[in-house]
Amino acid sequence: MSLSQILTPSIQKAIQVLFDVSVDKIEFQTTRKEFEGDITMVIFPLLKVIKSNPAELGNKIGTYLVENVSEVARFNVVSGFLNIVISDSYYVDFFNGIKDQKQFGFLSPNPEEKAVMVEYSSPNTNKPLHLGHVRNNLLGYSVAEILKASGKKVYKTQIINDRGIHICKSMLAWEKFGNGETPESSDLKGDKLVGKYYVEFDKAYKTEINQLIETGKTEEEAKKQAPIIIEAQEMLKKWEAGDEQVIALWKKMNQWVYDGFATTYTNLGVNFDKYYYESNTYLLGKDVVQVGLDKGVFEKDPDGSVWIDLTDEGLDRKIVLRSDGTAVYMTQDIGTAIQRVKDMPDVGGMVYTVGNEQDYHFKVLFLILKKLGFDWASSLYHLSYGMVDLPSGKMKSREGTVVDADDLMQDMTDTAKQIAEDLGKLDSYSADEKAKLYKTIGLGALKYYILKVDPKKRILFNPEESVDFAGNTGPFIQYTYARIQSIIRKADFDFSNKIEIEELHEKEKELVKQIELFPEVIQNAAQNHSPALIANYTYDLVKEYNSFYQSVHILGEADLTKKIFRVQLSQKVAEVIKSAFSLLGIEVPERM
């Protein structure tokens, strides 16, 4: 129970006793640093129902609390704010109550509540994962873990875009230029090999366009008449017709990609419970179009195409079925959402982790599903996020200059290795221990740098800055965790028992207060779908711990009771760091 939850009934009782008025809600905020207090009650809303001035009202309530509530030590009133100082005994009791809770702040899933399905990654099978996919995967995975910790049952899913003209481009280029090359013969990961032929297609396509332009064609005509694009379109038609040879090639090359993706996901530390494939879902939703027509949600134009008119909602008309009866992406997404609830009947909401260029698409999708009458449609959320840039500029795709996810992770590990070696504290480590540490630091730096930023904001990712061992970075927090583990290893006495301590040092109290916030931060992060709240809370906790570490003796404290309490407090901080970082998918090293 939080401090505000503890104080609310006591303040409501005080108002009832003192003024014979009942109030439903008490407003709290964090006490400003320049004032004494641990929590602040806002007085102004009460002036609507109680005839008094803020100072008199605050003093009367404060006096009542000091006399009747054991947790309240003293108070002060500044303007319309009642600053409440909480007794040390409250914080000692709180700490003793949570000291041995291994997953403090985490809630078990409520069996009465509906589950949430979180979709992320959802790549195309024609190239490797890139930097944009890294942000997508890290956000989706982290939000799924945060929702779990907040007490939700969660399914992690992705829909793999394994069909369409872009897939046929890689297939055709491999057929033309590949000479039977395989991942084994080329020593390339399967996704990289297929991506190589996507680039080869684009090069050949551009060459043919230029040749046609030289013969007098316009660029527009050349793009349509280039022989290689016509061949790719013919291959797509064969795929749709179930041509055995094309399907066999498609399956073979897709499997190469899946094997490559699996390695990337393992290295990135993300996973999935359920896979969907566009080749299985692209026909879904067409049957729903008729339902929508019958309900008057959709309307049919004279040419036979089917639309939805969302102009009353501030949007426009959106096509859901072409005049030739073929589906559009919107139709597929409608059908896939419905299919997911059929597959997992306990799902009551979905989170779609997709870039902000699709904001409009998801507004329309969610509105359509609501209008079709699905009760779970009100619990759909688009986890929209901004582009990731490197200092050298934006990512590109077809020219082969994309920032590859595997290369990025390796670069981060190499950067961590260079910085760690420069610091020169790894003499006692074996080669394997060093390699594991470099990866832990490098990936921790990458993940933290990306996740500490509000998802909606664009990121300029600076690899060197992210691996800094000072400031708001993953390695700084990992180093603090490792420092605490060192303290615990050196504590050559029993510090397991509950300690009764009369008075807390100011830094001890501030640290316990920071720990106390963790459950509320998890709930806020879940409600806002924001790993940034977890990341920045963890940084604040670590800053508070380092201030404590600099201000008091821990193992050097002469008073055994204080020494035991400070080791226990350090241990709890480490546990919260580890728990918080687990929600971000970041590992913490036991020593650094």
Swiss-Prot record:
GO terms for biological process: arginyl-tRNA aminoacylation. Its main location: cytoplasm. The keyword Isomerase does not apply. It comes from the Bacteria. It holds the Pfam family DALR_1. Its EC number is 6.1.1.19. InterPro entries: aa-tRNA-synth_I_CS, Arg-tRNA-ligase, Arg-tRNA-synth_N, Arg-tRNA-synth_N_sf, ArgRS_core, DALR_anticod-bd, Rossmann-like_a/b/a_fold, tRNAsynth_Ia_anticodon-bd. PROSITE patterns: AA_TRNA_LIGASE_I (PS00178). One of its GO terms (molecular function) is arginine-tRNA ligase activity. Transmembrane segments: none annotated. GO terms for cellular component: cytoplasm. A motif ('HIGH' region) lies at residues 123-133. It catalyses: tRNA(Arg) + L-arginine + ATP = L-arginyl-tRNA(Arg) + AMP + diphosphate. It is found in: Cytoplasm. Belongs to the class-I aminoacyl-tRNA synthetase family. Monomer. NCBIfam families: argS. PANTHER family: ARGININE--TRNA LIGASE, CYTOPLASMIC (PTHR11956:SF5), ARGINYL-TRNA SYNTHETASE (PTHR11956). This is Arginine--tRNA ligase. It comes from Flavobacterium johnsoniae (strain ATCC 17061 / DSM 2064 / JCM 8514 / BCRC 14874 / CCUG 350202 / NBRC 14942 / NCIMB 11054 / UW101) (Cytophaga johnsonae). The lineage of its organism: Bacteria, Pseudomonadati, Bacteroidota, Flavobacteriia, Flavobacteriales.
